[in-house]
Amino acid sequence: MGLELLFQGNQLNRLLHGLWITAEIAFISVFFACFFGIILGVLMTSKNNIIKAITGFYLEFVRLIPLLVLLFLAYFGLAKWFDIHLDSVTVCILVFIFWGTAEMGDLVRGALTSIEKHQIESAYALGITPLQTFIYILLPQSLKRVTPSMINLFTRMIKTSSLAMLIGVVEVIKVGQQIIEHSLFTNQSAALWIYGVIFCLYFVICYPLSLFSRYLEARWEN
């Protein structure tokens, strides 16, 4: 059976270490993406045409350029054009932050603009300043509404992190490929079992997050 491959030597530990690299990339990226995304989302609601143009261009640029292209540009371009040499994990985290910030910013923008205007007008009528209105009324409600989507962004980052293998990151899928290639001639069913285990590992991480996101949505809707 192909499953026995996992218990030969340190194969299982290698897979789990690869999964840890995947989770580490996703966690660090989503943490900073949420922080910068909140700032970006606030800027995207600005009435200043220059700020709106810059943030709009950034969002469209990230959406139009495939993430894989951004990874290649950052990994090979920084070294060639600017003589900046970063390891593949660092490059992957930076690109994911760049991508995630745009996604999170758009989510925050949508949450801010979805808040009823009469709440803002009522706050002003009570003598609350615009800054206080934003901090105590708009921001808490927006973060509450955007939290399920933020969790979904985290799961997307976990799944999308498999692209990191193309710039040399030894994450869980890369480790799986190495095990399969090493065992290809001795066990032809190795790919089925190894990828099956990788699927289960992704499922164990992502499915609880998905359930938690649905729980929050259902609870806050009621």
Feature annotation, model-predicted:
Residues M1-N222:
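Transmembrane alpha-helices and adjacent helix-loop boundaries
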